[in-house]
């Protein structure tokens, strides 16, 4: 009698992953998160919530270049004796700017050109002295009698030249959504600092169009943003009921905030005395337009804009009271940067899993 083959049913159990592989995978994920944390922590420290740089010199002093010791601001005598003009590199309504040399180092010498605007010039000097921090160009010296100011030189110039700079081969690696968003964060950090400065709430008045805004800021060689021009920085004092007006002329265009425009229509001629004052929320209105310039049109910038859509919509609220504070905008920008960096890092981790 022929025996029938006897088939044994075998259950195929799920394939087990060796515990050592899981441990290595978990370690890799933890290491990735640790590195990300350290990077973001270093980044936030570089921006800092502390207004004054820990390495900043005492009031009336400066540290220049790699020199560790602090030196007193240069006096009239020292400027006249030690600073040599090289060439004129700019001229505005208030002052002329000269690339100069001091002890074989490039510096910037600014001189008043219009005596009628000396109050603006001296106001700018006062602000520069009082607001020395990681957000403000470094003051090296001044001479009130001769209306001259000496500051640190930044070869990349104002933010107006940002896109041209990013197309230079040396800096093309910086032309990413990540670096551009960091510049926008720097800019908002400056606004937040001015709104909570040691002097009180200051409004950046020299900002009636995008080009004018960009001209007020410098791009440093390590790609950070510094405010450079503080000639028009009035103080808001709510407790005293004091608001501000940016100049005495009628302002036009969508770039300036609605409350900065003449509210009584074209049939009523503009009169400065009838123009209502306003507060620092005019600066908030302009943030989306300035940030849009920073973000440019590189790969990934549209994703950043999408994540910033809600906060930018809030910045554009017609009622100034409904707009966020500069601190709220800054917090949102930082959260978006953290989120996008995590998303950029996680795809590799998901594939490992």
Show which residues each predicted segment covers:
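Activation segment/activation loop of eukaryotic-type protein kinase catalytic domains
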Residues: 205-268
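Terminal C-lobe "cap" of eukaryotic-type protein kinase domains
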Residues: 318-344
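Juxta-kinase regulatory segment immediately upstream of eukaryotic protein kinase catalytic domains
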Residues: 2-88
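Conserved C-terminal C-lobe helix
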Residues: 301-318
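ATP-binding glycine-rich loop module of kinase domains
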Residues: 73-130, 136-138, 144-146
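Regulatory extensions appended to serine/threonine kinase catalytic cores
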Residues: 342-353
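Protein kinase catalytic-loop region centered on the HRD/HxD motif
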Residues: 189-208
